Amino acid sequence: MASTYSLRQRIALAIVPRLASVAICCLGVTLRYRDVCEPGATPGYDIPPPGVYAFWHRCLLAGAWHFRDYKLTILISRSFDGELIARTVERLGFIAIRGSSSRDGAPGLRNMQRAYLAGHYCAITADGPRGPSMVAKPGVAHLAQLVGAPVRTCYLHPHRAWELRSWDRFLIPKPFSRVTVAWTSPVTPDLPSVQAALDRSMALAQTGNNPQK
């Protein structure tokens, strides 16, 4: 794939992931994460792998630091921006599988299926790669159906953040901010259930209250 990139893009690919991963580490050590769970839910890292997880694209940065130690397998688009993201998160310990839940999605989902069967946590940005923002696409439900697993969702809410004017309203946590990580109980792998769970996780994270306490 690298041969299809322009000289400027190749230079960016050589530099940006290194700088971005260092920046994420410098920011990440200042953040304070706290889990909240709806009834019947458990934080994903307290459940042995494998598992299928969904979250919104706007949560990628906060998630890149928080989930760095779990060898999480994540589906990332084959676009140039996707290549930048893939190389960045791989430097943080993630396993990037190229593809999407739309164009070229079938090979990506098959490789995600193999990762699940090999015992990995598998995650998909449910509204990626191009939106609409916070509207779930069928990719994560299809993956869960392939492997016969439920879908678990989470939302990472920085209490102080910059919100970009991008399609996903991407969130950049401000240094030293708190980040609430909300988890929902597992749902059946169908699109309405996944959308509803993602909506619940966002609402729970933004209120910051744990209904189990």
Segments predicted by a language model, with ranges:
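Non-catalytic C-terminal accessory region of glycerolipid acyltransferases
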Residues: 2-29, 45, 68, 73, ...
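Conserved H-X4-D acyltransferase segment
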Residues: 20, 24-78, 85
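Short, composition-biased local secondary-structure segments
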Residues: 52-61, 82, 103-117
